[in-house]
Amino acid sequence: QLSQNQYSAFREHINYMIEADNHINLFEYTLHHVVRRHLDSAFSDENANVKSIRSLATVRVECNVLLSALVQAGHATESDRPTVFQAGIEELFTNADSAQYVSEVSLAKVDEALDVLVAVAPKIKRCIVKACVVCVVYDQYITVSEAELLRAVADSLGCPIPPIIASDNRL
């Protein structure tokens, strides 16, 4: 087991490796996020008093960001993205008309959204992951980027999914 100092050094080394080329790719983001989710709680009591969010409506903006990021990770054609996004939103909300596709989503924005969404009730988390899956499989083709981001999202929400094999073949 790591001491607090060893864990801090471990995190610093991971951050150094991730930032070495001044570009964070999706694999690096996923690694950082999974380590943060699983180990930070063991070395910090920061999340001990987090209240559960029980209304999906209160996290609509975060869901928009998350689904937009997944759509961008796997759908190269910009004209298709709003349609795929809408399919995911309709999985979550009965009134999906007010949902806004976010055309440019950074991994930092995804992190911010996940930091909020981690506090939603388990039933809502499952609904969010299901909407993410709808976006990923919409075109019956799963890219490596989509698979990695989906696994990071699901793991962050405490709803891990098995590894997905992305390929050049349609489902």
Locate predicted features.
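Small-residue-enriched hydrophobic alpha-helices in membranes
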Residues: 1-19, 23, 27-171
